[in-house]
Amino acid sequence: MRLWLHLVLLVATLEGVRSQVQLVESGGDVKKPGDSLRLSCKASGYTFSGYTMYWVRQAPGKGLEWVSRIYDDGSDVSYADTVKGRFTISRDNAKNLLYLQMSNLKPEDTGRYYCAR
């Protein structure tokens, strides 16, 4: 299982190097419980509008946790139960941008957030 995960990550990394895919997250900050925050992810090096996009996160000392998903055309979204009703994923295909609006933040939302395709 662990070897498989490392292999998948290696393949994803090599694909990114070959095609110059870049996903750059921004908007992180220190917040208090109950606050709101919007994260952005700028994509380049591929046809953004052709891919379903994801947000995942990693709490300190923990593994990766899936947060949310949005279809290529924005027609369907889904959320982890832990964030449902508080987080909203959206995208702007004209600007190659992915967003995660986070409201009513909780201590357990602490972590590093990543966008992925």
Swiss-Prot record:
It comes from Carassius auratus (Goldfish). Coiled coil: none annotated. Keywords: Adaptive immunity, Disulfide bond, Immunity, Immunoglobulin, Signal. This is Ig heavy chain V region 3. Residues 20-49 are annotated as: Framework-1. GO terms for biological process: adaptive immune response. Residues 69-85 are annotated as: Complementarity-determining-2. PANTHER family: IMMUNOGLOBULIN HEAVY CHAIN. Residues 1-19 form the signal peptide. Residues 55-68 are annotated as: Framework-2. GO terms for cellular component: extracellular region; immunoglobulin complex. SMART domains: IGv. Disulfide bonds join C41-C115. The keyword Thylakoid does not apply. Residues 50-54 are annotated as: Complementarity-determining-1.
